[in-house]
Amino acid sequence: IDIIGDTRSKIIFQHCPYLGIFYEKDKKLGLAGIYSLLMNIRKTHYELAVDLRSDGLLYFIKAKKKLFKHSNQSTLNLHSAERHFLAIKKVTNAPIPNPKIWISEKERLFSKKVLGKQKNILALGLGANFDGKIWPVSNFVDLADSLSGFFEAVLLLGSHQDAKKSSIFMKLYSGKVIDCAGQTNLLETAALLGKSKFFVGNDSGLGHMASAVGIPSFTIFGVGEPNRYRPLGKEALWYQDPGFNISIIKGAHIAAKIIQWI
């Protein structure tokens, strides 16, 4: 299977057993970059090509059969994954599989080195890509305090932008903390999540990664549409304030829901 994606997502497919060629689409290269990308892709005549981006590239790809994704307007009642799988319904009625990230022994050894003998780890994702999606750090601290009897250590994950939040968290929280925010790539992050007992975070990619490595998670939504964009899986819990004000959600309230689950 050949895939077109951006540079950030490439590493996720690094160990995928089905991957043929990963074509990077770099928006910074402009029209020249798109032209070069198309020239490379058009060297292959595909049996099937599927559009999940609506960026027009599918019209220029050589393929015996082309399938386009359904519009947002026609699928407002569906989860985003269900919407995307509708694109291939004409060729398969197979159920939507559980999300998965392929991790190698290298990443597994990395996670063992970082975590050592620590078990019962609570992983936290303190950041997101928009302020309206970010739960205050102090609320995460209250959550961790409320759950301290269930977990031996807190693992902080996220991007370089989240490192400042990690520093604040460590000043406020008195328990054991392993800070990896801004220090790992996506596969290393996935491996660390796989060694954790539970993940709690904002509406960000980390919640989806938690589902993809098979651990239970709790996503705290501010603005956003959890019915469409929550992590997939029976063990993926979520909560959203009715008024979409994430800051007023109490740490103890989320902790109580998690304790009922675990």
Where are these regions (language model features)?
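Catalytic machinery of carbohydrate-active enzymes
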Residues: 1-262
